[in-house]
């Protein structure tokens, strides 16, 4: 029987309902900003970062978590003796700052939240040093200061051998016209930036697949990839801050940005407006994702609804700017390509990939 994210215990319909309830309640608190000389700009609720508007700048705030990728690191360490906590620390920073930049904010400060079931977790010096070094490296890649954090011991809440990694990030948009407002128009080009692998989403399903493989995380990926399954899963996430900074430096207008995380390619239609996002140049799925689909097995539609499938970030730009945006990405070390276009089709909202026979309608994404 084919595996799915839902069968692994992750149900977005339940999670998204709670998120919508939080957004509705949160709106009732926005009046508090006036006492600080700030205001809530229109359309910020439901975006990847929350904006606060000042006289000549915006502040942006994000709280995010790693998820369960560190459990893969623990399992692989038990098999190989190598710690991957430098990698998962970079992942943790990436989850925050990649959301932050979608509104045009550049990261200023990042804080770590590291909750453990037992303070003895920190007695493993090699693991702890790797975690610290990786978090600092992630902040350097993001151009942000590591401002602090919290290390609670939560016995009875967090299982004894585990750690829960998360944090928050503060960003700033200045001048204000660098804000990315979602001004997407029919005919806009969609530019994809490559991911490093699964990055931080879909790991619950990936762990379930490992549990049913005879060699587990030591299974070769194949398809031309020399790594084991565990090694491939633990490749650190790409941090896309330098791309946005370079586009701003070159004066390139970005109409919208999407961090392709939970909900897979459905995230490409996060905007409320009814557009059809047509992906006309999908690349072949990288080796790791082909392995996942075969080993699960995971059906094609489920794979693209869950994983990034090799695409970590998407930029929506005027078609005449697409070559310049791709050049800016490549100049800062990213693999980028023209992947598709935005079109109108009445009130329809969807992501369509004709070459793969895939269409995700708007009702398959119930949260912004």
Protein language model annotation of sequence segments:
Residues 59, 65-69, 219, 282-293:
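Acidic-glycine-rich active-site phosphate/pyrophosphate-binding loop
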Residues 9-35, 39:
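Basic, amphipathic N-terminal segments that precede the first structured/catalytic domain
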Residues 31-196, 360:
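Glycine-rich phosphate/pyrophosphate-binding loop regions near the starts of catalytic domains
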Residues 2-9, 14, 24, 124-142, ...:
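Glycine-/charge-enriched secondary-structure boundary and capping motifs
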Residues 69-71, 177-178, 200-203, 266-268, ...:
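Short helix/loop capping segments that flank catalytic or ligand/cofactor-binding pockets
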Residues 176-227:
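Short, acidic (Asp/Glu-rich) active-site segment that either coordinates a divalent metal cofactor
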């Amino acid at each position: 029987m084919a595996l799915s994210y839902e069968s692994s215990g992750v149900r977005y319909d339940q999670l998204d309902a709670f998120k919508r309830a939080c957004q509705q309640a949160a709106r009732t608190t926005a009046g508090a900003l006036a006492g600080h000389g700030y205001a809530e700009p229109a359309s910020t609720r439901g975006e990847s970062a929350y904006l606060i508007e000042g006289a000549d700048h915006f502040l942006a705030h994000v709280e995010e978590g790693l998820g369960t990728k560190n459990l893969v690191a623990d399992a692989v360490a038990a098999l190989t003796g190598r710690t991957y906590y430098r990698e998962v620390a970079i992942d943790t920073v990436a989850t925050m700052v990649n959301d932050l930049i979608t509104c045009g904010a550049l990261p200023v400060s990042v804080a770590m939240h590291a909750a453990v079931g037992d303070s003895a977790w920190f007695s493993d010096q090699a693991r702890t040093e790797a975690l610290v070094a990786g978090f600092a490296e992630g902040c350097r890649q993001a151009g942000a200061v590591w401002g602090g954090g919290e290390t609670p011991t939560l016995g009875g809440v967090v299982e004894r051998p585990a750690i829960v990694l998360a944090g928050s990030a503060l960003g700033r948009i200045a001048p204000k016209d660098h804000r990315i407002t979602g001004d997407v128009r029919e005919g806009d080009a969609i530019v994809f930036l490559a991911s490093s692998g699964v990055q931080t989403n879909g790991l619950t399903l990936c762990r379930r697949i490992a549990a049913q493989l005879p060699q587990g995380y030591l299974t070769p990926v194949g398809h031309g990839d020399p790594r084991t399954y565990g090694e491939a899963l633990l490749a650190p996430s790409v941090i896309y801050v330098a791309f946005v900074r370079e586009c701003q430096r070159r004066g390139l207008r970005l109409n919208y940005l999407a961090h392709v995380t939970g909900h897979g390619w459905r995230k490409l239609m996060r905007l409320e407006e009814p557009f059809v996002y047509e992906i006309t140049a999908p690349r072949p799925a990288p080796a790791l994702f082909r392995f996942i689909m075969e080993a699960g097995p995971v059906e094609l539609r489920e794979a693209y609804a869950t994983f990034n499938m090799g695409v970590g970030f998407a930029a929506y730009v005027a078609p005449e700017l697409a070559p310049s945006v791709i050049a800016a990405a490549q100049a800062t070390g990213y693999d980028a390509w023209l992947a598709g276009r935005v079109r109108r089709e009445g009130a329809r909202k969807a992501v369509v990939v004709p070459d793969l026979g895939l269409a995700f309608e708007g009702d398959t994404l119930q949260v912004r």
